[in-house]
Amino acid sequence: MTQHDRLLIIDFGSQVTQLIARRLRELNVYCEIHPYQNVTEAFLKGFAPKAVIFSGGPSSVFAEGAPMPPAGVFDLGVPILGICYGQQVMMHCLGGKVERGHGTAEFGRAFVTPTAERLAILDGWFEEGREQVWMSHGDHVSQIAPGFQVFGTSPNAPFAITGDPARHFYAVQFHPEVHHTPKGAKLYENFVRLAGFKGDWTMGAYREEAIARIRAQVGDQKVICGLSGGVDSSVAAVLIHEAIGDQLTCVFVDHGLLRLGEAEQVVTMFRDHYNMPLIHADESDLFLGALEGVSDPEVKRKTIGRLFIDVFQKHAADVGGATFLAQGTLYPDVIESVSFSGGPSVTIKSHHNVGGLPEKMGLKLVEPLRELFKDEVRALGRELGLPESFIGRHPFPGPGLAIRCPGEITREKLEILRRADAVYIDQIRRHGLYDEIWQAFVALLPVRTVGVMGDGRTYDYACALRAVTSVDGMTADYYPFTHDFLGETATRIINEVQGINRVTYDITSKPPGTIEWE
């Protein structure tokens, strides 16, 4: 297998560290994020990075136990780029000075102007005299380390861009990875070019290497995979099937909470088109029976999660002799499981997943997507020949329509919701808007309203249309449909879906709202 050059991102706790990795992956550079406390001298030796980036972070170098890189990182002889706190830590370690941010803190947009000296990492910068950047710092560098020079300044950051070209050490006080630094991607491109990366980490290469890894890990053993029809599990299943053929059996659990025609689409796609061994477990009666009378969203999620594990175990036992469980774990999941702080966080919503399955079933994990971000999974799906209708699908929650039907769930409500959702998505596709939107769906509200249809009075449900734009689902804005589109959609839903007589549009952003209603 090809051994790719690797870039190490040492994470000091920034909220946007994953964006650094995304920018580098877009340049076909393989990189990994590791929290500073895990990066020991032994780790550095084993990882053998071709370049290193220090992320930003919320700490102060003056704080007791402040995050620090291992001293040996500066002796590797590879280029290093420090960002924000990463700049401060670099100066602190190499003999410069950092001061507390009394009156010199900068948060938000700023403009950096160049000095007379130019730096190769800044090729393409300052063509119009100054560059917009995004600052977010309290402390600041007051004296640069020996060997460093200043290459860019801002009103509150006289050392906004510094570098020691002889050692290929560079440090900036702003965040090049965020969209608010328009030429940030160019800075990363220059950095990896100076470090000698070939840009050879492509999805074609990843596919070949992943297949070889799966074959080496699994041998002649059997694998089971929980298939939901979503992008992650679909790509994982097709990749594993390409590697080991019918040693893989997929289990598709239909909990009765899927969209219109969804179960049939998944079965047709994987059993008929890909000829995969597939167990279609129609357990809708079990799930809907257990959810009868349940209105609390957390209880809904936990009931569905518990039953899913029970049902999956039951049907997986039918496979017989399976040693491995395949999961569509992605790189953000891996990063979060070895998080910078390891501290507790508030549970906003329980996540429906199969996290408890491997231990319960005594199975080993196959996770062929664990090095990839979501956009890379989609690219791999295209490489594998999955149809765009699957690859480009909007995210769909594990608990399905249960959390788009606030209050108690009934079969009647689910049928109304399915049909309204199908009309809405059809409208979005007809107007060519589907790919502009991160996620769109209908929520059926636990509210009945009076209406007039023909000469008669109606007393039916209200529904809410939801459509958001987002990059990663962490934050989201509502999609600005035209009034004509909304009016046309409302008319179609009311005319075509029996049981709804009022349509609203949800214009809440995230935060303060969440994307889903429950």
Curated annotation (Swiss-Prot):
**Residues that, per the record, bind ATP:** S228, G229, G230, V231, D232, S233, S234
> Glutamine amidotransferase type-1 domain location, by residue?
6-200
Q: Name one GO molecular function term.
A: ATP binding
What's a GO cellular component annotated to this UniProt protein?
A: cytosol
Q: Which UniProt keywords apply?
A: ATP-binding, Glutamine amidotransferase, GMP biosynthesis, Ligase, Nucleotide-binding, Purine biosynthesis
State whether keyword Nucleotide-binding applies: yes
| UniProt key word Ribosomal protein | no
For this protein, the Enzyme Commission number is 6.3.5.2
Residue intervals of the GMPS ATP-PPase domain: 201-393
Q: Which SUPFAM superfamilies match?
A: Adenine nucleotide alpha hydrolases-like (SSF52402), Class I glutamine amidotransferase-like (SSF52317), GMP synthetase C-terminal dimerisation domain (SSF54810)
Which InterPro entries does the UniProt entry name for this protein?
Class_I_gatase-like (IPR029062), GATASE (IPR017926), GMP_synth_C (IPR001674), GMP_synth_GATase (IPR004739), GMP_synthase (IPR022955), GMPS_ATP_PPase_dom (IPR025777), NAD/GMP_synthase (IPR022310), Rossmann-like_a/b/a_fold (IPR014729)
Q: Which reaction does it catalyse?
A: XMP + L-glutamine + ATP + H2O = GMP + L-glutamate + AMP + diphosphate + 2 H(+)
Could you name the active-site residues? C84, H175, E177
The pathway is: Purine metabolism; GMP biosynthesis; GMP from XMP (L-Gln route): step 1/1
Q: Which HAMAP family does the record cross-reference, listed alphabetically?
A: GMP_synthase (MF_00344)
Q: What does this protein do?
A: Catalyzes the synthesis of GMP from XMP.
Q: How does it assemble?
A: Homodimer.
| Name the UniProt record assigns to this protein | GMP synthase [glutamine-hydrolyzing]
In its UniProt entry, the species of origin is given as Cereibacter sphaeroides (strain ATCC 17029 / ATH 2.4.9) (Rhodobacter sphaeroides)
